[in-house]
Structure formats: structure tokens, C-alpha cells
A protein has these predicted regions:
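Flexible "cap/lid" loop of the alpha/beta hydrolase fold
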Residues: 118-157
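Short beta-strand/loop motif that positions the catalytic acidic residue
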Residues: 229, 235-237, 241
Length: 294
């Protein structure tokens, strides 16, 4: 595994903790909910091996990155723009994964001159204004996410789940893969990476400012809106994703003119495993290279 040390940047908006690893196409990566940039580095080794330079800031509230304006995808995008300026990068491919989808889309909307292309993978894109946008089986809990008085309850449940997943990583694998679980439960690579992911998730659950900020974004941010993004866009989503319903991918495609939706059969929310992983990664790399020619 290609590893890297955390770096820190002090800006007018606060501290950014980030990873800058690899050489090649500059790729600004917005990690998912529940774990920080270390989880993205764990899962995205294929990008590093395909000549991508991964720049992965911890999003607001995760580890040492400043929380800033609660529930603001714009604040996250602004921090990322400051990071690119510091690194003297004038254009980058932007990737948003899972809960990082809304901040990535916000970056592409607010900083089109910095965005060569956008990849939304298993990504949240629509505000949680109806139960259908929430993870499978959680639609009835929308009220809890809308009112801060219930935050302690959500935080407790998240920590409880993280502890269970760390004790038995197979629980985490089942939760994230949904009905794809029978297809990947005996995948040794998946088992090893999910065990490590469960450890990272447990760490973040103990200091949940970033997770709580993500919940606020999901219920309060506009997400992807009609015709707000103009760059080449690839949307990658497993049709059986149990955590981010496929509706999010269809919504993104309907809003972003000329976008391409790659509906895959992978590992549910875990697009890095399963039947279509190699196909997905080949298509993803081809898209990135086309949008950022040498």
C-alpha cells in the first residue's frame, strides 16, 4: 500500500489537514462520511497506481480540519480551493465519494475554473427532504436528522454501530454491501480493507464533529441543482447501494447536462469490490485521462 504523512495548512478560514500523495494528474478528493482521508487513501490505491496525484483534505470537523460553518458545503469547497492555491494547482479532477458528493458538487459549481471534470461515486447529491433519499431502512428517521435536539441519540447510535463493526468487521461489510453481501463476503481483499476501515470509523465516531457536520449538510444543503455544474461529469453508482439510494445518481444525471451515469454491479456502497470493480476502474481512469490530457 502506498502511504503518506498528514500535512497541515493554516488559512484565513482555519486549519486544513490533508494528504498529498502520488504523481500525475492532480485529483482533489472529497472523502465520505464516517471516516477521514485515511479511509480514502486505503480504498483508492488503484487511482495512485494509475498516475493520479491524490490531494485528500480532511473535510470540516474530521480530525484536525476546522469545523467552520456548520452544515455548509460551501465552507468545505472554500477550504479545498485554498488548498489548491497553496499547492499551486490551477486545475484538477474532482472526486466526491458518498457523503463527499455534495461538497464536491459545490466545489465544481463554485470553482468551475479549477475543475477539469467531476466524478461522483456512490455519492449523496440530493438533500434529505424525504425519506426516500436516506439509507435503506432509515427513511422513518428523517425527523431525527432535522432537529439538533436528537443529535446525541444519533451520535450514540453511530458510536454503537462503529464499535460493533470494529469487533466484527463482517458486520460492517454486510451493512455497506447490502444484497451484494453474498457475492463478496469471501473476498479476502475486501475483508482486509473493511477491517481497517472499521478501525478508522471507530476513531471518527469518538470525535464526531465531522460526522455531525455531514448530517447537517445532508438535511440543509441544496446538493446538486439543475444546470449548476457544466464540467464533464461521470456518475458511478451500484444500483443496489444500500446506503446512498440509486435515486441520487439519477438525480445527478438529470441535473448535470452531458453527464454519464455508469450503473454498476459491484459491492453495494463498496464500489471498490465485486463483479464490476475492474470495469468501473477502467472506465473511471479513461474518463479522468480524457478530461485531463497530458
Amino acid at each position: 500500500m502506498i502511504a503518506a504523512a498528514e500535512r497541515y495548512l493554516e488559512t484565513r478560514n482555519g486549519t486544513i489537514q490533508y494528504l498529498d500523495v502520488g504523481t500525475g494528474i492532480p485529483t482533489l478528493y472529497f472523502h465520505g462520511t464516517g471516516a477521514g482521508n485515511d479511509a480514502a487513501l486505503l480504498l483508492e490505491q488503484p487511482l495512485l497506481k494509475s498516475n493520479c496525484r491524490l490531494i485528500i483534505p480532511n473535510r470540516p470537523g474530521y480530525y484536525s480540519t476546522t469545523l467552520g460553518r456548520r452544515g455548509s458545503a460551501n465552507f468545505c469547497a472554500d477550504l479545498a480551493a485554498e488548498l489548491l492555491s497553496h499547492l499551486m494547482i490551477t486545475r484538477a479532477v474532482v472526486i466526491g465519494t458518498s457523503g463527499g458528493g455534495m461538497p464536491a458538487a459545490c466545489f465544481a459549481k463554485c470553482y468551475p475554473h479549477l475543475t477539469a471534470s467531476l466524478v461522483l461515486q456512490c455519492a449523496q447529491s440530493h438533500r434529505w427532504d424525504e425519506g426516500k433519499w436516506l439509507p435503506q431502512g432509515l427513511g422513518h428517521a428523517l425527523l431525527l436528522f432535522r432537529h439538533r435536539i436528537f443529535t446525541f441519540l444519533l451520535r450514540w447510535q453511530n458510536a454503537r454501530h462503529a464499535k460493533a463493526s470494529q469487533r466484527q468487521p463482517i458486520t460492517c461489510l454486510r451493512h455497506m454491501s447490502g444484497r451484494r453481501f453474498p457475492e463478496i463476503y469471501d473476498d479476502l481483499n475486501a475483508a482486509q480493507q473493511i477491517a481497517e476501515l472499521a478501525n478508522l470509523t471507530l476513531i471518527c465516531s469518538a470525535a464526531p464533529a465531522g460526522i455531525q457536520n455531514d448530517w447537517a449538510i445532508m438535511v440543509g444543503d441544496n446538493g446538486v441543482t439543475q444546470n449548476s455544474i457544466r464540467c464533464p461529469t461521470l456518475i458511478i453508482h451500484d444500483r443496489a447501494d444500500p446506503l446512498v439510494p440509486f435515486l441520487h445518481a439519477e438525480w445527478s444525471q438529470s441535473c448535470i447536462i452531458g453527464s454519464h451515469l455508469l450503473g454498476i454491479h459491484a459491492g453495494g456502497h463498496l464500489i471498490w469490490f465485486g463483479k464490476d470493480f475492474e470495469f468501473m476502474n477502467t472506465e473511471r481512469i479513461a474518463f479522468i485521462r480524457k478530461s485531463f490530457p497530458a
